[in-house]
C-alpha cells in the first residue's frame, strides 16, 4: 500500500507518489491511498482500541507493507497522516514501512518522527528511505522528474521493504503475537 500524506490543494505529494508507485509496481501490487480523497472521522470520535471502520480500514489491514509519501511540515509530518495512523492503530501492527519524504531540506525530520510513531505500532521502518529536496523544482507539466540518483536510492529502499515484508508476513502467519 502506498499512502499519500499531504492533503493540501497546492502539493507535490501526488506527483511524487505517482513516480514512487510506478517504481514500486515492479516488485509489489500497489494500492495507492491519497488522504486528500479520504474522509476520516473526527478525532474526537476515536475510541481507545478502535473506532468505526473508515473507507480505508480494510486496505490498511490487508497490506503487508507500506510506502508512505509525506512532506515535512514544521519539522514533522502532517496532521492528516497522524490522524490516519491513530485511527487505524491495530491495522498497522507487525508490518514494514518505507518512508519517502520531501521538503526544502529533504523531509528527513518527518521521516524521523514517523519512525518513533511506527515503532509504537510494532511497524519496522526500513533503514533506507528517500528524502527529496525541493521536489517542486523537479516538476515538468505536473509530472515529477526525479533528480539524479533518486531512482537508485528508492530501489535500495524497496529491496529492504520487500525483505521485511516477506519476513514479517511469515512471522505473523507462523508465530502471531497478541495485540
Tell me what each language-model feature is.
Residues 1-88, 145-155, 159-162, 168-179:
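N-terminal beta1-alpha1-beta2 submodule of the flavodoxin-like/Rossmannoid cofactor-binding fold
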